[in-house]
Amino acid sequence: MTELKMKGDNNQTKRAEDILSDDSLSESLINGKIKENEFQEEELFLAGRIHMAVSSNRIPFGEDQKNLLDQRIIDSINRYKRNKTFAWVGSAASLLVLVGLTIFFQLNNQSDISNFASTITAKSDSDYTQLMLSGKKVIQIDAQESKIAYSGNGKVIKIDAQEKVEQSVEADIASYNTVVVPYGKRTQITLSDNSTIWLNSGSKLVYPVRFADNKREVFLDGEAIFEVAPDKDHPFHVVTRDMEIKVLGTVFDLCAYTDDSTVNTVLERGSVELIYKQGSLFGPTKERMVPGMLAAYDLTNETLLQKKVNTKDYTSWKDGYLVMEKNSLGSIAKKLSRYYNVSIEIESTELAGETFSGYLDLRNSAAQVLSLISEMMDIELEQSDRLIKIRKKQTPG
């Protein structure tokens, strides 16, 4: 946590978070009673100025947001120390105050659907796919592969062409439905605008019962293939925890599991615009994709790299198979673990890094798929209930 050190006052140390909770200190900063030269370091005083600006707005500010703001201020200070080439900015003060206010307004302007998605607590280890309606009714779907289809007005929902559910829709009130797909199951959803989404195992999709007049927006945690109905006047937005994708009409795969360190987007056809953070505090970065490309966004370094790929290698899970091209055993195990809802343990990090290429038929069991891999790699399997252990094959003698 950033510490603000004041000269005098027996070397008392003020932490940055104290600025948010100490109204008297905030008022002193606002009214100029604490002078800049009372702080040991100009940069840290500026951090206090930024926190003061947040406090003066009197907007509720959660602990996670405080910590995120603290860390991003520290990062910006360190970058400024390393590189003082901002000729267009009059001083470090104006630079960092601008940075802080930009962060503050970014943090407090998350979309309604993101805020709503954060309240959903359904787990991915359930035995059922859960359809959560806006009226708090929850429908449990037992099928391993299920289909959900909405009518144009969002009031009628068909489930696997057998069950029909009706819900009330109020024209002027935004209401959301949520589908939570557990590990071991998949779901196909046709939304009220006729866009189709294939949700992979362990995924959550939040979407409006009926889209607003000016925007189509959904929230994804997990992996899904989107076939978006074209509508140039109403762009389709997919929001994740770390990225937003804007499309007009296209087919793409988005893999954004919370426990993964990267967000992968593969564009099969059409055009999308990626909106993401890239180590910059002056707003998000935007980058367009063309068909046949994979965009990998590294959440740790906030960097995005694109490369040309065979898109079928990334979308084939929808059709019941996987195509591996020098994929690590560790990444394959994670995919299979989610798909089949089994635990897969690999003996060592070294073994997890070995690669495999080939075709995997997902109509077979997890053990059968891994057995095929073991025939082509120097590994052996041990299975107990829903746990599969992979280890290096022991040589006789």
Across the structure, where does each feature detected by a protein language model lie?
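A residue-level detector for the "anchor" residue at the start of short, highly conserved motifs
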Residues: 82-91, 97-397
